[in-house]
A protein has these predicted regions:
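NTP-dependent nucleotidyl-transfer catalytic core
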Residues: 1-193, 198-201, 207-213, 226, ...
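Conserved nucleotide- and phosphate/pyrophosphate-binding catalytic cores
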Residues: 204-406
Length: 406
């Protein structure tokens, strides 16, 4: 199976400008394509992960990726998919974020001679002459057409600044510049970027009389139509200091049953034959599928060792696995009363709660688990035999301890 057909089977393609041309280019390893990343934060997120894996798939098929760091366009802010204006960042913030992106992307994509290249659009956008740009590029854009673009429609009622209105022109200019300077003949991006990408192909056609192509990637949404990649309203980061490998693993381990196979098909590099077989799994087997998804993605982002440790930690906490990677809290015989220790004492001794009253409050609010079971009885106690084997306690989502009597 060739790469274009694989992308179709994995459900990754949303829209294309010229299907046959794109099909032939990427199947024959003739595409030099780019994907842009505006550096609005100091880390990539799970939302970017989709684009990174696409770049990897296409590179493995012989095509050459161009990773565009949006050091210049970030100063404007992309209005696509937003109902409010993005926070303005300083040049220093943007430069710092761009460097963070560079370091992270080098972990996923192979850069070097005749491999992937990385460019920053600040290198050409910041030196543009405004009058020259208006004369050379502005004449190629119809305001009427721009206002009909989906990326602007959502903002018209709340107000769209002239600054943001220029974003389409800047992104289109990126494609034009990359086509001229690097022979970049194709752009990939999220489905919400379609209007901006068409602007680039049109600019190249009008200015150079050449054909360039665009393809959008299917947005990763759950069964309710909501974008995936956030937990409790917070982004799932690829930086281990912002989202730990364990939390990253748990995010994917906890996807809904209805979403797990979609995620495996779109995000992992497992063979399609294996995925088709997994798609027949039901009931308890879906938990195995979720473990597979979480392990494969964590391995890609954080490495095999971290993925294995996260999996073992999750299994220890939620049952059935080694407790090697769960932090220990050691207690002694002197901590027992009549050969037992109650749950509130263990929460305090382990450092999971500051006091017995804090422990009581957490239990009453449903925030304490022993293994996989929620603790509801504040008088629950454990004898010496249980404690010598070790008891895994959890407070909230991120605080775990294995309490062991030694």
């Amino acid at each position: 199976m060739q790469i274009y057909e694989e992308l179709v089977r994995r459900g990754l393609i949303a829209q294309v400008t010229d299907e046959q041309e794109i099909h032939d280019l990427i199947n024959n390893g003739k595409a030099r394509f780019y994907i842009g990343f505006d550096c609005t934060a100091d880390s990539l997120t799970a939302g970017h992960f989709m684009a990174l894996t696409l770049m990897k798939r296409l590179q493995m098929a012989g095509n050459q990726p161009v990773a565009l760091i949006g050091g210049g366009t970030t100063m404007i802010g992309d209005p696509s998919g937003r109902t409010d204006m993005r926070k303005m960042l300083t040049k220093e913030d943007i430069d710092h974020n761009a460097e963070c992106f560079r370091r992270q992307m080098e972990r996923f994509i192979e850069f070097g001679e005749d491999k992937a290249i990385m460019v920053n659009n600040a290198d050409w956008l910041l030196d543009l002459n405004y009058i020259e740009l208006l004369r050379e590029v502005g004449t190629c854009f119809s305001v009427n057409n721009m206002l009909r673009a989906e990326c602007y429609k959502q903002r018209m009622e709340k107000g769209l600044s002239f600054l943001e209105f220029n974003y389409m022109i800047m992104q289109s200019y990126d494609f034009y510049h990359l086509f001229k300077e690097y022979g970049c003949n194709m752009q990939f991006g999220g489905d919400d970027q379609w209007s901006n990408m068409l602007g680039g192909t049109e600019l190249i056609r009008k200015k150079l009389g050449k054909d360039a192509y665009a393809m959008t990637i299917t947005l990763l949404t759950d069964s309710q139509g909501k974008k995936m990649g956030k937990t409790a309203g917070n982004a799932v980061w690829l930086d281990a200091n912002k989202t730990s490998p364990f939390d990253f693993y748990q995010y994917w381990r906890n996807v809904d049953d209805a979403d797990v196979m979609k995620c495996i098909r779109m995000l992992t590099f497992l063979p399609l034959e294996q995925i088709d077989e997994m798609a027949t799994w039901k009931d308890a087997q879906l938990n195995t599928a979720k473990e597979t998804l979480a392990y494969e993605l964590t391995k890609m982002v954080h490495g095999e060792d971290e993925a294995g440790a996260a999996q073992e930690k999750a299994r220890a906490i939620f049952g059935g696995g080694s407790t090697e990677h769960v932090p220990e809290a050691v207690i002694s015989e002197s901590d027992l009363a009549d050969g037992k220790a109650d749950i509130m004492s263990l929460l305090v001794l382990s450092g999971l709660c500051a006091s017995r009253s804090d422990a009581r409050r957490n239990i009453q609010q449903g925030g304490v688990l022993c293994g996989e079971e929620k603790v509801t009885d504040i008088a629950k106690a454990f004898d010496g035999e249980e404690l010598r084997k070790g008891v895994v306690l959890r407070r909230g989502k991120k605080n775990f301890k294995r309490v062991i009597l030694k």
